[in-house]
Amino acid sequence: MTIQRLKSTDPVSIEGWSWQPFLEDAIKSLGGLNFEPYPVPDRFLQREDQTGSKSKPISVTTATWACKTEKFRQVRAACVSAGSAASVLNFVINPNSTYDLPFFGGDLVTLPSGHLLALDLQPAIKTDEVHTTHVWDQLIPIFERWRDQLPYGGPIPEEAQPFFSPGFLWTRLPLGEEGDDLIQSVVRPAFNEYLELYLQLAASAERVNAERSDFLLQGQRKYTDYRAEKDPARGMLTRFHGSEWTEAYIHTVLFDL
């Protein structure tokens, strides 16, 4: 049964979607922030299609949960459920440039080949110590504790390195009981601890002056432009929903700065 969603903060409930508990954790953590719906066009609130073969069709649901607050320009969750073909939660907090904050990024992906899982507080301007030092001093001890409990996901491309912090937690896990156990015992609490730190940083953040805000905005645009150009979900979403819908979704919802 399809539940009609009329605005971006209406609940996302997708039967069998594996990342539902993570989204519920995240929304609960935002509960005290007096958030309001972020404007998302109706056609991107929830879409259903089919993939697979004619003899073995697979139902696909892609939904968007999104809000905004005084300090967060956009908080959004891209949720994809496609049975054994894919299960995805991409949860991102885009701060307002009037506050000196990194991005929060949680990318949780299950494919037929395994789980690809990444968490970070991503810098808008990695070379700016005022922007990064106080974040990394608190993030790295958290990263080191969880990193030791997960296999390393492998190197990231050199061109992407300006957009990741030293606390980038990145792992690949196998399908099955071993991976599922690590997701519940390590990845989920790590996700919540990264998010808790981010919200603490936001709570103490104070407005910056106009010059600093413009500087941060330039860095944020470089980040969102890079993410829009290199979005690894582009191929999957195009296969599920077509090129026109996918490009519009990437540029007008996911990375709309």
From Swiss-Prot:
Top EC category: oxidoreductase
GO MF term list: cobalt ion binding; phycoerythrobilin:ferredoxin oxidoreductase activity
Reaction catalysed by this enzyme: (3Z)-phycoerythrobilin + oxidized 2[4Fe-4S]-[ferredoxin] = 15,16-dihydrobiliverdin + reduced 2[4Fe-4S]-[ferredoxin] + 2 H(+)
The keyword S-adenosyl-L-methionine is annotated on this UniProt entry: no
GO biological process, one term: phytochromobilin biosynthetic process
UniProt key word Phosphoprotein: no
Tree of life domain: Bacteria
Classification via InterPro entries: Ferredoxin-dep_bilin_Rdtase, Phycoerythrobilin_Fdx_Rdtase
Pfam families for the chain: Fe_bilin_red
Keyword terms, alphabetized: Oxidoreductase
Entry's EC annotation: 1.3.7.3
Family assignment from sequence similarity: Belongs to the HY2 family.
Record function comment: Catalyzes the two-electron reduction of the C2 and C3(1) diene system of 15,16-dihydrobiliverdin.
PANTHER family membership: PHYTOCHROMOBILIN:FERREDOXIN OXIDOREDUCTASE, CHLOROPLASTIC
Protein name: Phycoerythrobilin:ferredoxin oxidoreductase
Naturally occurring in which organism (per UniProt): Synechococcus sp. (strain CC9311)
